[in-house]
């Protein structure tokens, strides 16, 4: 029924599956009956039998050391990256139509089911052409989507992989109303989760947004970074303009290069302990397989309490 005064189905069909999928994330997948049944089969095969079930749900004959070439060129679209590193290139995405700048889903690494949460700034079509682009910023919808998925994974003791490529927080009226609480919810979900947590930094990782995305500060067990990643408080050019407001364009360029070398790249972050290892993009799969195998026996002794407040 048209419960909203002045609305009708021709104007805005709020009861449609597409609306519920795209605007509030209540629907994970929209399709025909056969397509939905196939999605359910895939999901059931990837999930443990219960919260104490083994996350090794399948045997793996895929090469654990398989090199993943050309991933760096597609780092804006984590769907491509996740499918490349997963066993047999399998990636099961959840809530694909909702908060498209944050990707969530399940992959397999050596037969182990792993939950993935990733920043998304680009979407490529089947022909490899860029079809859509987003800001590299955190939004309220994206944070809520990530928080809900992390809590789901933790409930089943499914390990979580985050792929970080973010440079700030979304600046809009919606963010002013909702983002602070959404960030708190996502941060709580990461820090409260007792499952294994690994963070992979593929592009930019700037400021508070980077900290929220499963950094060591909120509980990541291991943090890997591609050698070309940029990690710091802010973009080097912006930092140079703030520190040298009277400088000309050439001097700003030089100061930005100096700042990037000292403060705004993966190597200084690794030297300070924020990153455990710098890796080549092609070697991503083998390092992640080894990381989650090492963390398979992770156990957290929690204090007696009821629950958190977020």
Which residue ranges define each predicted feature?
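Ligand-binding clefts of soluble mixed alpha/beta catalytic domains
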Residues: 1-310
């Amino acid at each position: 029924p048209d419960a909203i005064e002045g609305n009708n189905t021709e104007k805005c069909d709020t009861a449609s599956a597409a609306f519920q999928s795209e605007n509030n994330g209540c629907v994970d997948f929209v399709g025909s009956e056969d397509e939905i049944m196939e999605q359910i089969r895939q999901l059931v095969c990837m999930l443990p039998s219960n919260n104490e079930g083994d996350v090794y749900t399948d045997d793996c004959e895929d090469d654990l050391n398989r090199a993943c070439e050309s991933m760096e060129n597609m780092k804006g679209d984590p769907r491509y990256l996740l499918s490349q590193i997963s066993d047999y290139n399998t990636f099961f995405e959840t809530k694909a139509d909702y908060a498209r700048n944050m990707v969530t889903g399940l992959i397999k690494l050596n037969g182990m089911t792993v939950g993935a949460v990733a920043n998304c700034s680009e979407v490529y079509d089947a022909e490899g052409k860029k079809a859509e682009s987003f800001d590299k910023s955190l939004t309220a919808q994206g944070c809520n989507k990530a928080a809900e998925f992390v809590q789901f994974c933790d409930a089943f003791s499914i390990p979580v992989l985050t792929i970080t490529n973010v440079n700030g927080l979304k600046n809009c009226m919606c963010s002013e109303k909702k983002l602070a609480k959404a960030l708190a919810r996502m941060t709580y979900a990461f820090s409260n989760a007792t499952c294994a947590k690994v963070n992979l930094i593929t592009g930019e990782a700037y400021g508070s947004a980077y900290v929220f995305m499963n950094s060591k500060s909120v509980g990541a067990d291991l943090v890997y970074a591609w050698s070309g990643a940029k990690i710091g408080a802010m973009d080097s050019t912006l930092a140079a303009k703030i520190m040298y407001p009277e400088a000309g364009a050439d001097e700003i360029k030089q100061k930005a290069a100096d700042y990037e070398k000292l403060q705004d790249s993966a190597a200084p972050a690794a030297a300070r302990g924020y990153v455990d290892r710098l890796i080549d993009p092609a070697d991503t799969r083998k390092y992640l397989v080894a990381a989650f195998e090492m963390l398979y026996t992770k156990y957290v002794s929690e204090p007696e309490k009821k629950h958190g407040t977020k």
